[in-house]
Amino acid sequence: MMRATSVRALALFGALQATFSDVHPYCDQIVQSSDDAIKKGLPGREGAKHCARHVATYTAGQAVATFAVTAALGYRLPLRALAAGTAVNAVTHYVIDRREPFKRFLRSRFIGKGGYLAHATVQRREGVVDEGGPGTALMEMDQATHRLIGVAASLLTTYLAIRSQD
């Protein structure tokens, strides 16, 4: 027989994971401004500014959606738990979207995706190869990594929320 705490944890994890996963594309693609999408990977302060602004809007959207879903389901998610899960997504989102650290990680011996990054590119304008936009390996791995991290963020949020009730 499953304990009531386990049932609550599984239900909360499912709700959080569905929310984090399904809200992600909206916040990452639609809420993000075109300017930030184009410039967030630029080197230096300019890129950092655009990436930070994108992560701020992404994080706000995710937090509002998470609060709305859990409240609609009659669950009061502890602020500490919501903040922790949201912070995991925000910090990692910034690192991934700055591009160069993520590309170094993907090209590392540990991951070994340099060939895939070089192979799956697109040409949007004659003579200009894009390695990071829609239709590229980098974009696919960016989205896959964000979603994987969303699982960890959901788990952390659930753990902290359930623990605060015990």
Residue map of PLM features:
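Short amphipathic, positively biased membrane-proximal segments
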Residues: M1-D166
